[in-house]
């Protein structure tokens, strides 16, 4: 740990910001691994479109993890990018859908994005009074995460605006319902 932080930011605020950003770093590391898992395990009609749609998002999220880790270091703290850090910071269950259809994976992935975006927005609110530069970083990330969720949802939405997995609160439940609706 260093004995400095950013000029104009107290050590206490820097520590609070770094703690928030550490959780975000773990979220991004978990998300890019989950996206690769989906990329490798999606099957069925529309496979190639979804398979190829996911890789750019993986790279984007990996980039977000790097930006957040570098911001933590800039604050004079040590970013933790280990599997143990992901598990320690995790407030969600491990992604549970294995080899499955496009619809099943996308429905489960939509719920993953719900959690990531909700947590990111909470961090954005908390950063309002702590560090506007870090807040700005997460605001930019949130916009892109929301756009990608829209890409996912476009595959799941009916002409009437209903999602195939509406009402489901678990990835498995969402995947099961989407699979049944697409059969």
Swiss-Prot record:
Record's subcellular location: Cytoplasm, Nucleoid
Family matches, as Pfam families: Ferritin
Any GO MF annotation of the entry: ferric iron binding
Record GO biological process: intracellular iron ion homeostasis
Keywords associated with the record: Cytoplasm, DNA-binding, Iron, Iron storage, Metal-binding, Oxidoreductase
Positions contributing to Fe cation 2 binding: 70
EC number in record: 1.16.-.-
Domain of life of the organism encoding this protein: Bacteria
Residues involved in Fe cation 1 binding: 39, 66, 70
Main location: cytoplasm
GO cellular component annotations of the record: cytoplasm; nucleoid
Region annotation (Disordered) ranges: 162-183
Catalytic activity: 2 Fe(2+) + H2O2 + 2 H(+) = 2 Fe(3+) + 2 H2O
Transmembrane segments: none
Sequence similarity: Belongs to the Dps family.
Subunit structure: The 12 identical subunits form a hollow sphere into which the mineral iron core of up to 500 Fe(3+) can be deposited. Homododecamer.
Functional note: Protects DNA from oxidative damage by sequestering intracellular Fe(2+) ion and storing it in the form of Fe(3+) oxyhydroxide mineral. One hydrogen peroxide oxidizes two Fe(2+) ions, which prevents hydroxyl radical production by the Fenton reaction. It protects DNA from hydroxyl radical-mediated cleavage. Binds DNA with no apparent sequence specificity without self-aggregation nor promotion of DNA condensation. Is unable to protect DNA from DNase-mediated cleavage.
Domain comment quoted from the record: 12 di-nuclear ferroxidase centers are located at the interfaces between subunits related by 2-fold symmetry axes.
Record-given protein name: DNA protection during starvation protein
Gene assigned in the entry: dps
């Amino acid at each position: 740990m260093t004995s400095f932080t950013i000029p104009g930011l107290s050590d206490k605020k820097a520590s609070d910001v770094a703690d928030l950003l550490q959780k975000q770093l773990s979220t991004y590391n978990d998300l890019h691994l989950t996206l690769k898992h989906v990329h490798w395990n999606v099957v069925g009609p529309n496979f190639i479109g979804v398979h190829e749609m996911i890789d750019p998002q993986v790279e984007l999220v990996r980039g977000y993890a790097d930006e957040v880790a570098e911001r933590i270091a800039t604050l004079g703290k040590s970013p933790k990018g280990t599997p143990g850090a992901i598990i320690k910071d995790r407030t969600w269950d491990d992604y549970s859908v294995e080899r499955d259809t496009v619809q099943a994976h996308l429905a489960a992935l939509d719920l993953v994005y719900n959690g990531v975006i909700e947590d990111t927005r909470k961090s954005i609110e908390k950063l309002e009074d702590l560090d506007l530069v870090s807040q700005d970083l997460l605001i930019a990330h949130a916009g892109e995460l929301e756009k990608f969720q829209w890409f996912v949802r476009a595959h799941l939405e009916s002409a009437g605006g209903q999602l195939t997995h509406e009402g489901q609160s678990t990835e498995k439940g969402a995947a099961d319902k989407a699979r049944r609706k697409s059969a």
